[in-house]
């Protein structure tokens, strides 16, 4: 819980700096937090069959925050670049899906494969962390490829709401 108390506000500040907009900064956090909550619920299933380390919730939070924000950042940044270049809403979303969507998929699969290696360590803590990490990465990846484009489509230009004037020049 202590790590989350530090990581969440810090992530929000960084995202505000990067995007210069409150709504654009909150979208990646929303996706990451949703992935964390979903994974914390889903971890109950494997915990019926294998021991789950008591620190798994912290691992899920920190990894989920990292990949959830990262995957959203790829997508949202690309969609905003396309809009700034004059593309319409749908064309911008399609371009983001074709480029950033593919990057999210490849990145997510790579992390899943790498984390699967810990399953063979023989150490119960590593196995537990591997399962939690793989689950949160998969949930964040699926959310980034499905929920995020739908959310951006629904938000449209409102993703720019809450612009922070002095940050406008930095993004």
Functional labels for PLM-detected ranges:
Residues 1-171:
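Membrane-embedded transmembrane helical bundles of large multi-pass transporters/channels
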